[in-house]
Amino acid sequence: MTVTDPIADMLVRIKNANMRRHPTVDVPYSKMKEKIIEILLREGYIAKYEVIGEIPQKYIRVYLKYKGKTPVIQDVKRVSKPGRRYYVNKEEIPRVLGGLGIAILSTSKGIMTDKEARLLGIGGELICMVW
């Protein structure tokens, strides 16, 4: 079955696994998904991840992070979608929950957080927000 929006599919898999308190979740591999997961790891939203398998069955195993029984990722929101792309310039980059969450952008310098994009003074496509 073909997925129309693979990034949204990955985010929903992570969100659903978090809600059910699963220790891991597997998502089909792509370079963009791996970059987004690297950001989640760097920002402390997941414990670790590993790429498993060979193409065409390659996937990413994400190890979820919890504080006691509470998931670290409270919610995720997909902003830019295949049918409606959402671009922001450097002045329009949103602050997620007053700086408690992160926004992930795809810029000309690669995929990065809202803080990194503000420091570089560049905008881009607003992929998602995590808090």
Curated annotation (Swiss-Prot):
Protein name (database record): Small ribosomal subunit protein uS8
Function per UniProt: One of the primary rRNA binding proteins, it binds directly to 16S rRNA central domain where it helps coordinate assembly of the platform of the 30S subunit.
Cleavable signal peptide: none
Family label: Belongs to the universal ribosomal protein uS8 family.
One of the protein's GO biological processes: translation
Listed GO MF terms: rRNA binding; structural constituent of ribosome
HAMAP family registered for this protein in UniProt: Ribosomal_uS8_B
Cellular component terms (Gene Ontology): cytosolic small ribosomal subunit
PROSITE patterns, per the entry: RIBOSOMAL_S8
InterPro entries for this protein: Ribosomal_uS8 (IPR000630), Ribosomal_uS8_CS (IPR047863), Ribosomal_uS8_sf (IPR035987)
Lineage: superkingdom: Bacteria
